[in-house]
Amino acid sequence: MLVLGIETSCDETGIALYDGERGLLAHTLYSQIKLHADYGGVVPELASRDHVRKVIPLIEEVLNQAGVGKSDIDAIAYTAGPGLVGALMVGGAIASALAYALGIPTIGVHHMEGHLLAPMLEENPPEFPFVALLVSGGHTQLVRVDGVGEYELLGESVDDAAGEAFDKVAKMLGLDYPGGPQVAKLAEEGNLQRFKFPRPMTDRPGLDFSFSGLKTFTLNTLQEAEASGGVDDNLRADVAACFQEAVVETMVIKCRRALRQTGLKRLIMAGGVSANRRLREKLQQMVKGEKALVYYARPEFCTDNGAMIAYAGHQRLAVGQRGDLSVLATPRWPLVELPSIKG
């Protein structure tokens, strides 16, 4: 079965073709970073309009890459949520219209299930069951995964997600959008020991996260420095390093707890923040001590992409799950509500 995947949940237009026997045949991605940079964040209306301009040309591009035609497509998977409602509707409308014209089925894919399954596209994918750390956009979650659609939420952020905290701290430091990679880059020049940032909610039982306090601590640190002599480049780098280390160590501590609590020995990390090099290093150290394994998607599949949507959609289409041709756009959609592919 050849599945066309369409990702338009936020500020990236991702298109891919996945075949059940041959694997990933082609994928392409257009990022709107430059479009939104002047605004310091994603402008939903601009995002939607840009998806309208890009989806069809990118579909043609992946078809050419794979050497197939529209008539070869067996089904279309598109991101149905969570995400920006206008952006979701663009992808859903194009998917439904094309499917109607071709006489093929569609399926709406959960964006976070796409991220969760992205490591399955690698050469040595993890086996079920495993613990998943999902760190993408407005989500920071720990999930027990026993199969596709078999998800148990172990913990999540009670306020800001890790990615949101990175973006907000980036603004405090005067860094460009998107903030996460910019903070990580600046942190490489900083002194991890200069400031003692808290590790939120690690002093109590449980697997939930909280990052709003770290955001406030960062702001207070910068304000105190400004009042006592000013903020120079060295101090900004030190703040970035200490903030990042606090976020990373907090997530590592929670992942260790999740592995011990579930008794599982496989951990996957997915979502945009999973590309963070420091987080990967610290998780690798942690799982070694736990005699466990950690898996990631390749960097290009950590951020939003069409390949993960095509793959996730294929898993459900292959067992007979289908959508109708109405456009499904669900800005808020709990992952644990998804049905198992076992029926």
Swiss-Prot record:
The protein's Enzyme Commission number: 2.3.1.234
Catalytic activity: L-threonylcarbamoyladenylate + adenosine(37) in tRNA = N(6)-L-threonylcarbamoyladenosine(37) in tRNA + AMP + H(+)
Binding site for Fe cation: H111, H115, D304
Keywords (A to Z) from UniProt: Acyltransferase, Cytoplasm, Iron, Metal-binding, Transferase, tRNA processing
GO molecular function, one term: N(6)-L-threonylcarbamoyladenine synthase activity
Cofactor dependence: Fe(2+)
Binding-site residues, substrate: L134, V135, S136, G137, G138, D167, G180, N276
Gene3D superfamilies tied to this protein: 3.30.420.40
Cellular location(s): Cytoplasm
GO biological process assignments: tRNA threonylcarbamoyladenosine modification
InterPro entries found in the cross-reference section: ATPase_NBD, Gcp-like_dom, KAE1/TsaD, TsaD
Cofactor: how bound: Binds 1 Fe(2+) ion per subunit.
GO cellular component: cytoplasm
PANTHER family: TRNA N6-ADENOSINE THREONYLCARBAMOYLTRANSFERASE (PTHR11735), TRNA N6-ADENOSINE THREONYLCARBAMOYLTRANSFERASE, MITOCHONDRIAL (PTHR11735:SF6)
Known function: Required for the formation of a threonylcarbamoyl group on adenosine at position 37 (t(6)A37) in tRNAs that read codons beginning with adenine. Is involved in the transfer of the threonylcarbamoyl moiety of threonylcarbamoyl-AMP (TC-AMP) to the N6 group of A37, together with TsaE and TsaB. TsaD likely plays a direct catalytic role in this reaction.
Family: Belongs to the KAE1 / TsaD family.
NCBIfam families: gcp_kae1 (TIGR00329), T6A_TsaD_YgjD (TIGR03723)
Protein name (database record): tRNA N6-adenosine threonylcarbamoyltransferase
Lineage: Bacteria, Pseudomonadati, Pseudomonadota, Gammaproteobacteria, Oceanospirillales
Name of the gene encoding the protein in the UniProt record: tsaD
